[in-house]
Every structure is written in structure tokens, then in C-alpha cells.
């Protein structure tokens, strides 16, 4: 009997999910992307070669894994085909092992133009999107006007819908944002080319997944971004436009909740965030700079520097509750090597001195909150590439043990470097 495992980020994304998914695919036959778009990059380093995947599931680097892009993903055909060709240039046969849902909403050039125009228009109040059209594409989906992958294969219907949509969006672009219009004829021509390339890879993903399940195959669901970028449960409005929590697997892949066996939450040994929004444990001093430099904290897709701070157990506790997380994987422990003192936020304090054990639900409610820290001694020895728990420095083990105690959940995996083998597995999700 196969197992169905979900891997998701418990913070603001960039937790190192790509490497862990790649590692776990040694035990999986199927890997599924179920939400988001090409706004988040999963970085893998195998035999010293770095690969950044944006849309294609990380399992593609394993030769016997079938990969699916499910209906919860907003799909840029241009970005996907570019990524496919990049991987094919490295000798990876993508098209035989990649399947795409007919129900994926399309990201088209007018979505990207709208995204960038809005961010520019908002100035200092901008959310800090990646400018890749994700939000506008999800808006079209919710407004029930989106063009989907399946529409590409009905030329006349697609052309009629595209004409209507472009008329609507071009009005906003030209009249409100004072930006150039997107050309209909050139977009229609591109779309016909995309249709021919995508046609062999499309299917009813939900139906395929249930066939894999019935055959007893292991299925791995690969989340993008992190819990606190969730449109409902994140630090709204500084969030993404999709649901990033485990419930998104059910809707975004058409996979029933009782079929999920294990949820692995990925967290860094510290905290990072890209773009605007609250960040209670953010470090603006030399320690924060040191963590950023050692951790090479720059966005895989945008190259933007990430904000860095101490481990926030208040946020993690809520992530665990929201996602019924079975176990944690802590990444980038080696980045903390050499620090004299480490801090874990165990609560927040408001301006009146009241102690809060849970995070607020809205971004503005984080204003004036200060973290309440617990201090632990650091370690001077290297944890890089350690593969046995007992070989870690005593203070590193104590730090991890304290995280387990505070959160009330086991650390099942530990990443000590970017390579596949730089991992300690205490309990494998597929076991």
C-alpha cells in the first residue's frame, strides 16, 4: 500500500522545500505541484550542479518519477516551455514524464502587465509581488473569466474569450494605469504555438492521481511558498494569491483529505522573509547580515535579498495547527555555526506588556509587538554536511531538542547543506 505525503513550508517560503522533495522522491513514484505559479523557485544542488525549478515538480530530476502540475497551479505557458527547454538542454527527458491539468488557469501577458503596473502605482504601499502575473491570474479564476489550459485546444472558443478578456484588461491598463495595451493578434499567434507544444502533456490530473493511489504508488505533494503567505491564514495583505496550507492539496489536486498519510513541515533553523510585511524577529544588526551572507539569502527567482531573523516558535505553533503537521524538517542549521548566542521567540509582548502566545491574524496587528525570547548557547563547531545526529555539537542538539519541546512535535529530518546527502533522516515520511 502506497503512502501520500505533503511537503509544505511553515514560514514565509524559501525554507528549502526543493531539496527535501528531491531527496524524498527516491521513495516516490509521483510528485505533484498543487498551487502557486512560477513566482517561487525551488533550488536543488546535485553533484555540485545547481538547478532552479519554478513550475516543474522537483521530482523531474529523478528518472523514474512521473510529475504532475495540478489544477490549483496558475500556469504561464511561456515560463513552462522555457523551463522544459532548459532541462532538456541538460539531458532531462521532461515531456514524457510531465502531465498538466486541463483545468489550470493560464497566466498571459496582460496578467504580467497588470501585476507590474499595480506595484508601480502603489509605490511605497506595494505588496512586493514578483511581477509575474500570479495575482491577476487568480483574480480572473475567482471572477470566473479565466482562460484555462483546456481552452487552448478549441481555437475559435479561445479566440472569442481572449478578445473579450483583452478588451477588459486593456481598458484597465491604458485608462487607469496609463500603460500600453497588449496586442491581440500577437498573443493569439503565440497561444496557438503553445497549444501544439502542450497538447501531448495534458490530462485529467485528479483522475490520474487516483489511479496511482489505487495501484499502491507513493505520491508526494510539493507545496510552494509557505504558510504565512497563504491568502487566508497569512499576514494579510502581505501574502500570495493562493492557499499555501495543506487544504490546498484537496482542492488544488482533487485529492480527498482522508488519503493524506503524512504532512512534513519544512522550517529553517532561523526565519526569513522576502518583500514587505510584518516580521517580529527580524534582525537589522550585524547578526542578521551574517545570517544572510552565510545562508546566501537571495530569492531563487527574483534575486531579491531576504530579511533574516531568529526562529519564531509562535508562528510555527500555528503552522502546525493549521496543517496537522506530522513532523518537521529543519534546514540550514549550518548557517548558525559560530554564533555565541541563539534566540527563539516563544511569545509576543504588546505595548501594554500583555503576553501573547498566538500570532495576530492581520498584518497591522503585528505593529508594536515585540518578541519574547528564550536564549540558548550557540556552538563553534561545524554542522555542515553532518549526516548522523550524534555527530552534531552538543549545543546544536540542545537547540533542536528545545524546538521540539516548545512546539510539541518531532523533528524527523534535518538538512545540514544543499546537497542531497547532507541530510539526517530520523523518521522517513514514507516509512
UniProtKB/Swiss-Prot annotation:
Pfam families: Adenylsucc_synt (PF00709). Substrate binds at residues 300-306. It is found in: Cytoplasm. InterPro entries: Adenylosuccin_syn_GTP-bd (IPR018220), Adenylosuccin_syn_Lys_AS (IPR033128), Adenylosuccinate_synth_dom1 (IPR042109), Adenylosuccinate_synth_dom2 (IPR042110), Adenylosuccinate_synth_dom3 (IPR042111), Adenylosuccinate_synthetase (IPR001114), P-loop_NTPase (IPR027417). It is an enzyme of class 6 (ligase). Keywords: Cytoplasm, GTP-binding, Ligase, Magnesium, Metal-binding, Nucleotide-binding, Purine biosynthesis. This is Adenylosuccinate synthetase.
